[in-house]
């Protein structure tokens, strides 16, 4: 059960990292790197001519979907929800996370995309899907 709780915690922590896109950025320092979590600069929405208000609304929807999907998966891992919710929860959370991270891409966000891809792969592997989750 400890492994299941740790994995559920990981899923929730990964989901909640996306809140950094709407949280205030820390103060910039002279030699510090730029804050990678920003909804003000999107290569995708800028090219499509989407305004900043709509861009932020789309980002909020993707953040909420990411948190919701990974929360369902975490509750499924702990046994609070049926195990059949595991794969759809991961798929919903990871796909919306990837969409957010690509739309507002910064090189540091590549790690998050990698995590999402691994979670999708793991959730659809026969050994860990459905009722046979062995985490």
Predicted regions located by residue number:
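Membrane-interface extramembranous regions
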Residues: 1-135
